[in-house]
Every structure is written in C-alpha cells, then in structure tokens.
Amino acid sequence: MKKIYSIKDRNLLVECSINEYDELIINRLSMFEQTDKYDCYIKIKQNKTIFRINSVDQIINGQLKHTDLYQLINNIISNIINDSENVYIHSAVIEKNNKGILILGDFNSGKSTLCIESLKAGYQILSADQSWLNYKNNLFLKKGSKYLAYKNNFEIIDACNEKCEIKAIFIIKAVFDTSNYEFYIEN
C-alpha cells in the first residue's frame, strides 16, 4: 500500500508492506485528502519502520504491533498539525443545534459508546476518534476522523468535516453499561 495524504501544510507518504495493517492505516488517515507529491514519510516494513518529518530519519527496528502503529501514526499527525492555533487529539465530537461537545478520555474509556448513545438524543457524530481542533478565537472542530471503534467492531461513519464551534468539554472516565443510564445534556 502506498498513499500520500495532505495534512495541514505537509504531504505525508505512507508506504506499508504489511497487508494486514492497510485497513488501519487507511481508516486512520481517512479524514485527510490524498495528493501526489510528498515532503515527509512513514515506511512500514516487516522488520523496521522508518519515518521522516523534520529532515531527520527515525528508525524503529523490528515489526510494529498493530497498537504501536496506531500510536505512531497519531504522533506523526500531531507533530504535523500541532502549533499555537491547532491541536490534534484523541477525542470525539458530537453536535446538536450547532453546539459541539468535545469528549475526552483514554483509550477504551467509552467515548464511542457515548457517541452511539448520543444519537438517540438527536446528536450527530462529527468526529469519532481523533479531532483536529482550531482555537484562534474560539474552539472549533476543523476536521474529524470517520473511524469509529465500538464493542470491538470498527466502522467508518459518515462524519461531516464542517467547522463546528465547541461549546462544552466532557471528560469521560469509563462507560460500563449504558442500559441503566439515560443520556441527557443540559443547555
């Protein structure tokens, strides 16, 4: 697999020779447009991974595990996006009536579960796993990932990438059983 993605002001070549990682990589980068020229790269091979962001090659010897690859790609994207007005974070964003709610939490804390439950209350999922936020004057969602992990299943949601102002931030510790709770958000 070989694809080039336009991320902010950089073009990232992603090259992978491990077929079982292709879907993860494509899903992880689905929020970005593809292009044809690159100025930085990540090359994932059976016995080593090489990446270059700021003119220096970094080499990781050995085959990356699925979970390590997920983190590495997120860190590379963060390195490209993060500056004084932009941040790329592990989060979700839901929206109703042009009011966005940023949901923060650790891996497997229940962000996707909360997103699914919010649909019942009329919310729309704008970002399922990673969010590119812009905070020039107010906090806005610039782009959101379409990759939704829920109950050990993975799917691509039809997330919109429209800018949405974030009106509230919700930090989640863990969601164990949503059948005993009613989803309600006060205005």
Which residue stretches match the model-derived regions?
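Conserved glycine(s) of the Walker
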Residues: S109-K111
